[in-house]
């Protein structure tokens, strides 16, 4: 507990300092931390003009210090009096018990208004601080129209401590502001970043939204601008390929930028703008791809595959488009889209893939056939060849290449009872003789007859020589190999073999098996 001195009047303070105190007057039971009314307990003088110490709590004992005489003291004596007074005041404060906490004051209407004003000021300061921090972070001018914040304080009559803060949402997302701030930032060397053109990004956002095709068409001026961006990107890719051949590996952005004598940020910006320009032109002509692909629908290919082929042709046409010739891009890419759709139709419509030129020739032959039928002329090969101004051999080869493909697992006839019937595989002859069971039986029967003939006609040595030489059940051997196995000369083994063959011929004729030994 500390005592807070309060000086009430300058004259009273002077009188207190000019008074003298006796030892008995400064006892704790006579020191008061307040102002005594009138003279009070120690004698007259003083009255209400005296130096007082305001008591912090009513429970503190009242200790009074009263001047007995009015004497004139020197400055040194006054200092001693003040030190004695402070010493006894601190002792009295130490003996007093701690006071209870003061009750909360009842707010007045003036204090309520001041509190609301302070709260409003603090909220405004917080909002302004956040605003300045965001401006510093994004380094963008803070537009009051797009980034206005409205702060409203709703005061309730019953509860004045609640305040509602209403922040209006900006039309530009935080992510876009961060990206713009990064693009507008500066490099470590102090050079400015080369940011992507904001007009290009805004146009891209208007063209499509999450893959949805937009009905907004590009003007000729926009197409020319985007075409120049694409040409620039193609040129950069060509320079990158040349540098790759020169270095022997994939060059980095720094290496490519150094070879082109530009900065890496500028290189990245130009390549990104080329990518965005190609994407914008592709999305703006997507409806043309769909309309062309729908004309080739129901020809054996899914519409999605046709659209994919048309998109490949569209990308090729966008890269080849030259805006300086004055043609519209839709007129130019139409033929590229049509070529891509036709190629997709040729590659996916048949089970066995036909070359693209042959597929185009078949389309021309089909068209000539319909024209001849409309004119009442028989669509023969000669008439079709004359109509297309090609040879009859080319027409014949193209028509023979088109064969209907059927699966052997397909049912040969429709089932009447709902059960699976016989398939086409059951009605097709197998040309492989090894798969014929009768052929296997005949081969096994002939082997048995030959073995019986050998066992019944020849002795053991003759049978072994014949089996080794002709490879019956084993590998064929020469007369020299057989002679080494039997320890005989080559000529002797050959004579034994010839004699054995003559015996077999006579025995085969008797059993009507001479056809087996006809070659011998």
UniProtKB/Swiss-Prot annotation:
Entry keyword Membrane: no
Alphabetical keyword list: Chloroplast, DNA-binding, Plastid, Sigma factor, Transcription, Transcription regulation, Transit peptide
SUPFAM superfamilies: Sigma2 domain of RNA polymerase sigma factors, Sigma3 and sigma4 domains of RNA polymerase sigma factors
Subcellular location field: Plastid, Chloroplast
Basic residues biased stretches: 175-187
One Pfam family from the record: Sigma70_r2
Gene3D superfamilies, per database record: RNA Polymerase Primary Sigma Factor, Winged helix-like DNA-binding domain superfamily/Winged helix DNA-binding domain
DNA-binding region(s) from the entry: 479-498
Tissues in which the protein is found: Expressed in shoots. Expressed in the tips of fully elongated leaves. Expressed in leaf blades.
Name of the protein in question: RNA polymerase sigma factor sigA
GO biological process entries: cellular response to light stimulus; cellular response to redox state; DNA-templated transcription initiation; photosystem stoichiometry adjustment; regulation of DNA-templated transcription; regulation of RNA biosynthetic process
Annotated region (Disordered), positions in chain: 37-57, 87-117, 171-190
Disruption phenotype: Pale-green leaf phenotype due to reduced chlorophyll content.
Main location: plastid
Compositionally skewed regions (Gly residues) per UniProt: 37-49
Gene that encodes it: SIGA
Induction statement: Induced by light in dark-grown seedllings.
Domain of life: Eukaryota
Native source organism of the sequence: Oryza sativa subsp. japonica (Rice)
Family in the record: Belongs to the sigma-70 factor family.
Positions of short motif Polymerase core binding: 305-318
Function: Sigma factors are initiation factors that promote the attachment of plastid-encoded RNA polymerase (PEP) to specific initiation sites and are then released. Controls the transcription of the psaA and psaB genes in chloroplast, and thus maintains the abundance of the core protein complex PsaA-PsaB of photosystem I (PSI) in the thylakoid membrane. Maintains PSI activity, sufficient rate of electron transfer from PSII to PSI, and photochemical efficiency.
Residues annotated as transit peptide in the record: 1-66
Biased composition (Pro residues): 96-108
